[in-house]
């Protein structure tokens, strides 16, 4: 059956749907309007970054209502309807392969919070599908949970679906649960039948070639306890989901979700940039285009919601998806549009133009999206070529030896060339080669282990002893450091010395001490541990240099040196924190909270913490950002922080249930594990964060704040280092000393240093310019001897020659001089070796470009590639470089052959 005939068959399957607006945008609005007229509040899609810090991405429409379903939040509405943007990557290998798998999709949903239940949900679902959308009732099947007789009866007796089209299914298909315990219940699904002529007998709803599930109704009526027993819920809820892409496929009469108007415009854009027609493509090309269409939607919406490419968490999903787009685009031959350096932004512009109905913010954030796509694509392109070459060699070896690709090799591609494992697996699968996934994971684990070992600072033997101590004590240390920096009476619960638990440690011993009560802060949350002293009544003194947690955080361990006397287990000590160090750590910690708020104000609410260190001398703050802040932005951040310091704002710290902290809007760090009760540090109107660290009581105590540096530490991760409080004074003193030294060396007053340096720079530039001019003259002199080597090809004068020891700028001057001497029809390619490096230049005048169809960039690009490099330029002039001078002669020969062939008379 031809594609046109199949489309006609699909379109004619639902006569009542014809004549209606069945565009994706219209289906979305018709769904929402249908439920709005039935008392549902129309609510916007929530972010792809969910409130719950334990969930990576929004994967279902019900996620924004989960606290209501779980009884953790009061309901604002009894009924609601939404269109929710979702991202799932668990079926990423099926994207483009099957008709309906996606990473990004829209879930249309209607919800009831203790209001209507099964009967209304089933009736409205049927009315929507067969009435509003006009589906042929004879093509709609229903599934119910095998034990849900009530739902079966509603579908049969109330809605009127024949028993022959109602299927009872097992728990894995038709029973929903949020987890092992909590709200749960049976569900009922609506399926569309593409081939009813196959009959009722033996029909299998799992047959994807015949059926598509398009609407799922979850009846949350039960609560499952820890023992597995279920009891009825007091309030029964409805949670439904209809895949917009699936309904669009049915109503638009197309064979798969990708050919709907929700995705096809993106695919067509990619195809046009590849110079191909989707309808004329083979299956492999179509699959590649579908991957591009799907993944481009996903990354556009994710970046709009503040998720930027990185190597961790959500950011890695963006990176992984975008790299799949880039690779498939390369395989299709997609090139950037004229004037552009990357091709993904042009494709994303189509996705953005179609986003209004789902999320109006996407269009508003278009500049951010396009900039991030360009940055990440160009970054990946730098390593992709080398990685592809290595992978091709590995695959050829695997074919010859009839072995799969080893996990070690797959990891090398990942670690060295930035190749995600799934891309390696994709390429290998295309070549019929398997990948040792277990070996990859082993190599990954080994690297993590080595990394952890390299950063290990705690003695392993001592750590084991402390773990045993924690188990033996069965108690926890009590921290009183929020209220006080000293303790008059603390009992020594345990002493570890030399990796062993001891009863007594002599003078000079380095020990780990566990106290029952301590004012010492143990390193956590980015803040370093306190230092200070311990004293016993009989005159022993211990200098504390570090404080850590052990035993799963139950005990606080003081690393100390016995400087006087001896210390015994069971002794009572006075514990005194060094107040100057604590004051500096507190100032730096509060400053990081202010810094995060300032970054959000200046760079956008998308900024989130990726790590921090609050030491005694300075602070460090890592954050997610796709690009470096400008100097002006950093100054604005600095001024904001200092402004808040001068406001003398009082801080409050309060413990509360984590649900209450979320409701207050407290900032949480993704990936951090929080207990049921959390500590919220609040600078009213400025900052509110979950934090267990020590802080100043008033921002004025910080005194001042100064940024020292800002830099990228990983893709998508930036780092700011700064000082606060006393550190600012010390910085000013140090810089004042440097200024005085410079003034003395330059023999000018401090205020004239800038002018004197500018004058010296001008002198240097003039000298460099003179040197460059002399090198150019030397190159021209050398090139003069080459004019006689030019050969006439047709009406052109072709000169391809080697001019060693000449830098790129001088090589360009030489080419221009030769062109002037050769006159009309000049076609010049020059190469120069400087050690192992290669410089290349090509110059073609207008006549050469017209007669031979030659482009300097293309000719030079091929030559540079032979020398292990690259480059480009305009049709008339191009420059390139390489890293393998041994191939320069071969590269020039290839260029000569290309130019001669193009210009020879036909």
UniProtKB/Swiss-Prot annotation:
Annotated segments matching region Disordered: 1-22
Q: Which PROSITE patterns match?
A: AA_TRNA_LIGASE_II_ALA
Under the heading Pfam families, the entry gives: DHHA1, tRNA-synt_2c, tRNA_SAD
Basic and acidic residues: bias regions = 1-10
What's noted on cofactor binding? Binds 1 zinc ion per subunit.
Highest taxon above the source species: Eukaryota
HAMAP family reported for this sequence: Ala_tRNA_synth_B, Ala_tRNA_synth_plantC
Q: What is known of its domains?
A: Consists of three domains; the N-terminal catalytic domain, the editing domain and the C-terminal C-Ala domain. The editing domain removes incorrectly charged amino acids, while the C-Ala domain, along with tRNA(Ala), serves as a bridge to cooperatively bring together the editing and aminoacylation centers thus stimulating deacylation of misacylated tRNAs.
SUBUNIT field = Monomer.
The protein's name: Alanine--tRNA ligase, chloroplastic/mitochondrial
């Amino acid at each position: 059956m031809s594609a046109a005939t199949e489309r006609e068959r699909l379109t004619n399957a639902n006569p009542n749907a014809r004549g209606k607006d069945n565009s994706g945008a219209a289906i979305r609005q018709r769904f929402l309007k249908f439920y709005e007229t039935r008392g549902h509040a129309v609510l916007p899609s929530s972010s792809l970054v969910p409130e719950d810090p334990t969930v990576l991405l929004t994967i279902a429409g019900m996620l924004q209502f989960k606290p209501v379903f779980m009884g953790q939040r009061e309901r604002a509405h009894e009924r609601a309807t939404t269109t929710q943007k979702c991202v799932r990557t668990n079926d990423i290998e099926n994207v483009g392969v099957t008709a309906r798998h996606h990473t990004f999709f829209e879930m249309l949903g209607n919800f009831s919070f203790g209001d209507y239940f099964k009967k209304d949900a089933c009736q409205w679902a049927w009315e929507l599908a067969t009435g509003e959308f006009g589906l042929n009732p004879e093509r709609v099947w229903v599934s119910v949970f095998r034990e849900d007789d009530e739902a079966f009866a509603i579908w049969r007796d109330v809605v009127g679906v024949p028993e022959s089209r109602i299927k009872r299914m097992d728990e894995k298909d038709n029973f929903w649960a949020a987890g092992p315990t909590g709200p749960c219940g049976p569900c009922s699904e609506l399926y569309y039948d593409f081939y009813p002529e196959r009959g009722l007998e033996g029909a299998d709803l799992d047959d994807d070639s015949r059926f598509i599930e398009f609407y799922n109704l979850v009846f949350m009526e039960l609560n499952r306890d820890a023992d597995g027993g279920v009891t009825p819920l007091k309030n029964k809820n409805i949670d439904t989901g209809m895949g917009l892409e699936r309904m669009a496929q049915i109503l638009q009469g197309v064979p798969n979700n990708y050919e709907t108007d929700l995705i096809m415009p993106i695919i067509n854009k990619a195809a046009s940039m590849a110079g191909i027609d989707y309808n004329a493509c083979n299956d492999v090309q179509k699959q590649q285009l579908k991957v591009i269409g799907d993944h481009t939607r996903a990354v556009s919406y994710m970046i709009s919601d503040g998720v930027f490419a990185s190597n961790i968490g959500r950011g890695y999903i963006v990176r992984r998806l975008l790299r799949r787009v880039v690779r498939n685009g390369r395989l299709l031959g997609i090139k950037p549009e004229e004037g552009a350096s990357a091709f993904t932004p042009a494709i994303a512009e189509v996705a953005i133009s179609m986003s209004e109905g789902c999320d109006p913010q996407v269009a508003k954030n278009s500049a951010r999206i396009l900039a991030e796509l360009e940055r990440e694509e160009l970054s990946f392109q730098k390593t992709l070529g080398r990685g592809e070459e290595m992978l091709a060699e590995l695959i050829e070896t695997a074919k010859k030896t009839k072995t799969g690709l080893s996990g070690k090799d797959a990891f090398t591609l990942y670690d060295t060339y930035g190749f995600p494992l799934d891309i390696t697996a994709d390429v290998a699968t295309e070549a019929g080669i398997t990948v040792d996934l277990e070996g990859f994971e082993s190599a990954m684990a080994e690297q993590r282990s080595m990394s952890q070992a390299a950063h290990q600072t705690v003695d392993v033997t001592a750590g084991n002893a402390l773990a045993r101590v924690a188990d033996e004590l069965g108690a926890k240390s009590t921290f009183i450091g929020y209220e006080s920096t000293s303790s008059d009476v603390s009992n020594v619960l345990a002493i570890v010395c030399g990796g062993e638990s001891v009863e007594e440690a002599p003078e000079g011993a380095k020990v780990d001490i566990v106290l029952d009560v301590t004012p010492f802060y143990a390193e956590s949350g980015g803040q370093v541990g306190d230092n200070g002293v311990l004293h016993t009544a009989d005159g022993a003194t211990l200098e504390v240099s570090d404080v850590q947690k052990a035993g799963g955080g139950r005990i606080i361990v003081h690393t100390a040196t016995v400087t006087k006397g001896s210390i015994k287990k069971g002794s009572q000590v006075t514990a005194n924190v060094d107040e100057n160090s604590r004051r500096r750590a507190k100032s730096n910690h509060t400053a990081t909270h202010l810094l995060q708020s300032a970054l959000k104000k200046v760079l956008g609410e998308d900024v989130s913490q990726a790590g921090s260190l609050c030491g005694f001398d300075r602070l460090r703050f890592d954050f997610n950002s796709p690009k470096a802040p400008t100097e002006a932005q950093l100054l604005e951040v600095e001024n904001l922080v200092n402004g808040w310091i001068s406001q003398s704002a009082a801080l409050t710290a309060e413990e509360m249930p984590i649900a209450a902290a979320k409701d207050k809007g407290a900032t949480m760090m993704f990936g951090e594990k929080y207990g049921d009760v959390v500590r919220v540090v609040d600078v009213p109107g400025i900052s509110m964060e979950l934090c267990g660290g020590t802080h100043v009581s008033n921002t004025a105590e910080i005194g001042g704040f100064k940024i020292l540096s800002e830099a990228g530490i990983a893709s998508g991760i930036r780092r700011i280092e700064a000082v606060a409080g006393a550190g600012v004074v010390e910085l000013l003193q140090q810089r004042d000393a440097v200024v005085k030294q410079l003034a003395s060396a330059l023999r000018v007053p401090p205020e004239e240093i800038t002018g004197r340096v500018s004058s010296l720079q001008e002198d240097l530039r003039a000298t460099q310019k003179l040197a460059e001019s002399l090198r150019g003259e030397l190159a021209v002199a050398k090139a003069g001897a080459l004019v006689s080597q030019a050969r006439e090809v047709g009406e052109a004068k072709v000169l391809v020659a080697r001019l060693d020891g000449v830098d790129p700028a001088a090589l360009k001057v030489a080419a221009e001089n030769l062109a002037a001497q050769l006159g009309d029809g000049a076609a010049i390619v020059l190469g120069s070796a400087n050690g192992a490096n290669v410089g290349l230049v090509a110059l073609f005048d207008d006549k050469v470009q017209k007669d031979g169809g030659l482009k300097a960039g293309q000719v030079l690009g091929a030559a540079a590639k032979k020398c292990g490099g690259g480059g480009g330029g305009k049709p008339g002039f191009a420059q390139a470089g390489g890293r393998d001078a041994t191939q320069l002669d071969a590269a020039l020969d290839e260029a000569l052959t290309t130019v001669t062939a193009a210009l020879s008379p036909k």
